[in-house]
Amino acid sequence: MQEANAADQTPFSPVIGVDIGGTQLRTAVLLGGQLRSRVSMITGANPTPERILPRILRAIEQAIDEAHIPRNTLAGIGVAMPGPLDYRTGIIYSPPNLPGWGQVPLRDIFLQHYTLPVYIENDAHTAALGEYMFGSGRGCKNLVYLTISTGIGGGVIIDGKILEGANGTAAELGHMSIDWHGQRCSCGNMGCLEYLASGTAIARMANEAIADGQGAELLAFASTMLAHPTTAPDQAALPAVQEPEALEQDDMDDGEEPLRVNARTVARAA
């Protein structure tokens, strides 16, 4: 596990943050945990390293200029992006939402341009760390963070440390199969949670519904959901995590059985 200790941060040294996502690219300069500048752009089609990395390097330069800080005071660069990746070596291993990123030595690429320490980490893990240090997780020893965006991912902090797992893919629940007879996900598995419930999946299913002549029903459903936002935990869903066996086997088809298994796994880890 990696230590997640806010006390280790040098509060007066500016740092560069980079977020490489399947939908958006972001760079920022932070000083003492406060945002000094930020540059955002759309990832775009065909997001290969050859197309994206030059844009990111230009965005970093823009963020530094807009932050109005001396370059010789920069302490390091932190890069968050979808896994799988090796945070020790900084090598990226074919993220499903970023085609063409197989075996990319991302840390070495950044080191060719900057004489600064460079840290590469799974984006959901960094989000969990941010929540632990600066958000709702402050004061907690343990937390689970779930992200639902272009994909679905998770990060776990246990006793103040990031849970990496054997190969850095701990809490990658987006690519757990919840329907073994479902459609093939971009990762190659069948019926992944990400394929069925991510932001990308919701957009895909909405387009399919519109193409099938269900646009009016979809709009009515969306209006109802917006009129009644969720403001508290769904009490009906809690037994699925607290007591997975409460999901009776007789009430499940083949696609729902993996959900019970995954719920049991989460409950045991909690």
Locate predicted features:
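Nucleotide/phosphate-binding catalytic cleft detector across ATP-hydrolyzing
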Residues: 1-15, 116, 136-143, 189, ...
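Short glycine-rich, Thr/Ser-proximal phosphate-binding strand/loop in the N-terminal lobe
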Residues: 3-6, 10-54, 58, 91-94, ...
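Glycine-rich phosphate-binding loop and adjoining helix at the ATP-binding site
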Residues: 44-61, 65, 72-77, 83-144
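Short glycine-aspartate micro-motif
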Residues: 15-19, 73-78, 119, 142-147, ...
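Glycine-rich phosphate-binding loop of actin/hexokinase-like ATP-binding domains
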Residues: 138-196
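A mobile "lid/hinge" subdomain adjacent to the ATP/sugar-phosphate binding pocket shared
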Residues: 196-270
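Glycine-rich phosphate-binding loop plus the immediately following alpha-helix
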Residues: 112, 120-124, 178-214
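Short acidic-glycine loop/turn motifs at beta-strand connectors
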Residues: 31-34, 88, 158-159, 180
